[in-house]
Each structure stands twice: as structure tokens, then as C-alpha cells.
Amino acid sequence: MELLLGRDVLTSPGAAAQSPGGDPGRSVKLRLALLSFLMLFVELALIRWLGANIVYLSYYSNFVLLGSFLGIGIGFLRARSRINLFPWTPVALAVLTAFVLRFPVQISHTSGTQLIFFGALKTTGLPTWLMLPVIFLAVAAVMAMIGEGVARTFVLFKPLDAYRLDILGSIAGIAAFSALAFLNAKPLAWGIITAVTLLVLSGTRIGILQFAALASLAGLLTANSLISHDLWSPYYRITVGATTKAQTIPVMVNGIPHQAITAAAKRPAIFYQPYTQAPRNPLNNVLVVGAGTGNDVAGALRMGAKHIDAVEIDPMIYKLGTKLNSDHPYQSPRVSAHINDGRAFLSQTKKKYDLILFALPDSLTLVAGQSSLRLESYLFTLQAIQSARAHLVPGTGVFAMYNYYRTTWLRNRLANTLDVAFGHAPCASSVGQHQQQLSVLTVSVSPAAVDCVSTWHRPSGVLPPATDDHPFVYLASNTIPSFYLLTLGLILLASLVLVRTVSGPYRKMTRFVDLFFMGAAFMLLETKSVVQFALLFGTTWFVNALVFGGVLLAVLAAVETSRRVVITRPQLLYGGLLLALAVAWVVPADSLLSLSVVPRFALAVLIAFAPIFLANLVFTQRFRDVGDSTVAFAANLLGAMVGGVIEYVSLITGYRALLIVVAGLYGLAFLTGRRKLTAAKAETGAVPPTLTARSASTAAT
């Protein structure tokens, strides 16, 4: 176990340059799998932890993701460098942790007219222009060090053998992090797992400085956990404040005021307008989406609701409501609580409701791994409101929603969505001013079922409803906001400079330009899968984890296939991939919502994962015989980073159009890789049969 416990896998550049020979041994295999586990685990931990401490990153989760891809790509480019940076990983992690704990940031600055982020507050800590570049470069540095450790072991294997072990380690990493999310584990647990893994990989060769850094990392996270008393859900860092003079309990998420637990009797009258404006509503069945800590559930009970389905996506927020809400709404026998996504709940139930209430559903965060999709995005599309309408009792059912909508154009957009979905204008009331203005929109299947105090009047230039394909309700126009463009431009510029500095002339990667395009395309394909499953089954952390796990399993299946089978006509794979993308285009995700859960799941898996499997067959058939696996893999990773940037095009086109971009990128991969395909065909002595089966050992030669 000497290699696993810390012996340098490469002692010189010359060793790295040697072609992989026989079986490197069990200990080296374990080391590569463990390094890959560490790489994905740390990446996920950084996305969660940095987003919780630097509020701006809650809305830019792929900012850290892009830095991670850049860093890992640079690490692979350094696989043959004389100086090994992997042993410095503990120091880099400790410094990054100390920096963030010393300078936590709450950022509210946006363009103000193009995009709304709820929870906006004044900035604290270091200015944005300084903090974001520092975090991006720090993440890239940490991941480059870990990536270099992976690459120095990766190069000892035949390409597909190494890729297989990398995927197995990654699957273990996402499984471990998902288990910690299920247990509501604090960052201390993430830090301990990271530190122990680094200790195992370093073994007896760990230096005093590295050991001190690991101890500091654990100490910093321990002290922070003991001092802050923060709770961690699968979505947020949650802080419960002291009871105020008004007898409310403030709840903050990721450093932003989110809820205030208040007795139902003390809530302003405007919260009860959905009831007072529908005095003839029997309230036999009420659905509250965004039930939170129970304020709105308690209000429904107070107004006489006979049964309430309370839907809350965050299990920790729900638990706080059961413990701290003085009205104890969740303990009522008239209340059934559901930990689920609101849109998913609507698609899974057949019940009819007298009142459906969207009560302040404001996630303050994005779906992990996706740049622009918030947890509540699919609640406010036209199709979502139409789904809610279909679940109302015919004739008398009432739908209502309220929130601090911050701007007039957003309030009008949502009112217009109700107008289109129900065929007539909703009741509209507001109290307060500017960003503290609370607005209530109420509408019924039958206009006679509600008594409006004031009715919404359509202004000129009102925005159209958001749709399931373009669910960006907080985006005022189909464009990429200027602050996104500036940030992405700087990321690309920094990446070009760093890659050139580390690897020298770009021409060493030009022979793998087709793999670069494959990486960009696959990133978009993965994004489309995340979005599709979020629509069909909810934006919960569990669905997200299953999707990423499913993607890795599809990749593993492609690797195992390519280790055993040589496809002598890869053009057929490209044709099959194009066909699978065409099917995904012809069968949009929302067309599956009418199906029951089992057939919906089966078709969703087939439509989403068939292109992923075929795309990875294309990649692995090309990757299997590359002469320089680490540079080839780096090109693919850097392509994935560029794909993460291209992903923002969905703000203009919607998600469905990403399939066209994916097809175009794979077309470029085919055109730029034709010479390699011809060479591979000649090497295998191509004969009429399309597939040539081989043993696992022969297939990787």
C-alpha cells in the first residue's frame, strides 16, 4: 500500500513520459479512485460552502464550477511538471477557508433593471470587484493541486482504465456528499472527510506544514461550528435569531433575512385577503406552497381551513417551524406536511383544492450546477399556473400568491400570467413602498367567486409570462445581463492567460480540439438533463443528486462498453447521437408531465440519458488510443468550462435551443476529429462489421 499511502507516483518527468505498460497494481488503482473521490467531493463542498458565506455566489453557483473545471484542467496539464503541487493542497484549502471566514460577503448589487435577486441587502465585507476574482483564482488553485494529484496517477494507466477509475471515484464522491446532505451535516463533517482523505493519500510522507494546515482546517471549521450555531440544510446555511420585541423570530439563510416566525394573530391583514376576498369559499381543502416555518399554514387554520396540504422544499425550515412556531400549525391534525417541490407536488396529486396559495416562495439560491435556475423558477411559469388552475375546485376554487416583488414590472408580469392562465384579470393589492412593498394577487376560476377590492389593469409594455422552456421570471428581457457578460468575459480572459502560462503554446492541445468541443457540448447536455428532471420531478437536492449520479453511471456504461468493443465506424455513433438529440427536440420535457410518475420517469431517463451515453461512446472511442491522456483530458475539461459559459445563452433562447448548440458542437468535434477517426479505423484494420469485440485487456491497448 506504499503508493496509496503517499509515495510519489511520479518521481521525475521522465517517468511521466513513459507509456503505460502492465497493470500498475491494486494500490495505485485505489489511489486514483481515492484522488478522484477527493476531487469531486471538494468541488461540491466548495460550491455549497462558498455560496453560503459569499451571498453573491448563491446566485452564481457555476462561478465556482467554472473555477473548478479551469483548475482541474490546469492540474492535468501539469502532470509532467518537475514540481509536484499536490502536497500543497492542505495549505491552499486552509488559506481559502481562513480567508472566507475572515471576510464573509453579503452582496446585493445587480443592474437593478435586468434581473432581480430577492433578499437584496447592502454589501458587507470586501468589495465585489476584489472578492470574486480572489475566490475564482483560489478555487482554481485548490482544484489545480488536486487535479495534478489525479493526473500524476492517471498517466500510469491506459486511458480508458484511468477514466474508469476516475468515474468510480467520482460516483463515490457524489454519494458521500449526498449522504451528508441527507444527514444535514455541517461543514465540519466535510472538512474532516477531506482532511482524512488527504492524510491517507499523503501517509508517512506528509510534511509538518501540511499536517499543520490540515489541523488548522479542522480547527477553523470546528470553531466556526461552535460559535455560529448555524444549521445546515441540503440548500442553505440557516441562522435563527433572537426573539424580537415584536415577538417574532428572524430566520436567515446564507446570511440574508428570509423569514420571521410570527403568530398568526399578529400578521398584517393583507396576508388574509385571499380569504376575505372569497367569503363564500368553504375551504374544505387548502394547498399552501412555500409553507416555510408555518406562518401561512397557521393563518389558513385561523381562517377555518378544514384540511391543509403544506408543501415545503427544505426539511430543516420545516423542522424549525415544528419547534419554534408558537401556533404549532404543523402539529394540527388538520395539516398534512409534504417535503417536496411545489410544482412536483402539483404534478403528483389528483386532489382538487378550494384554495391554492403560493406563500412567499423565495428560494434565494440556485439549483446546484446550473447557472440560472432557482428552486422556485418552475412555480411561476404559465404552465405552472395552468397546472394550479386545473387543481382548483370547478367554479369556486381560488388561487392566490403574495410576495415582496420589489419592482412594478415583476408584479405586472405575474399578474399578466394569472390573467392569461385564468382568462381574466386578478385582484391586486399592495401595502408598503419600494422594496418593502408586499403585493397580493388573487384570482378564481369564476370571477364571481372573489370580491376584488381592486382589480389589476394591464399597463402598456407588460412582459409576457415566463414559460417552462424559459423560466426566468426575474429576467426583464431575453438577454444576458451586463454583469454576467462582464464576469464571463473576465473568466475566459483569465483562463486563456493561466492555461498559456502553465502549458506553454496552445498548439500542444490543438491535436485534441475535437475533445475540447466534446467537453463543451457535454456540459450543455448535462445542464439540459438537470433542467429536464427539475421540471418533471422537482428542484429538490435529491432529484439533483440522482441526475448527476445517473450521468456518471451513463458515462461508466460507455467506458465499460468501449473497453470491450471497438467501433470501427465512429461516424455511426455521431449519427446515433444526432438522432437522439432530434428525439429530445421533438419530445419536449413538459409533454411528459401529463403521464403518471412511472412512465414519466422511464421516458425521461430514455430521452435524457440516451444522448449522454452515446456522447460518451463518441468520447471514449476517441480517448482510448490517445498518446497523451492527461493533455487530452485537460482539453476536454477546459471545453467543459467553456460549455459552462455558453450555458448562459439559455437566458436568450431558452433551454430547448441548447440542443441545437449541442448538435453544432458535436458537429465541430466530428469535423475537427475526422483525421483521427480515419487513423483509428486504419489501425484496427477496418473490415465490414461495424463492431469488433475484444477482451477488456486487448481493448485498451
Model-identified regions with their sequence ranges:
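Alpha-helical transmembrane segments of multi-pass membrane proteins
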Residues: 1-701
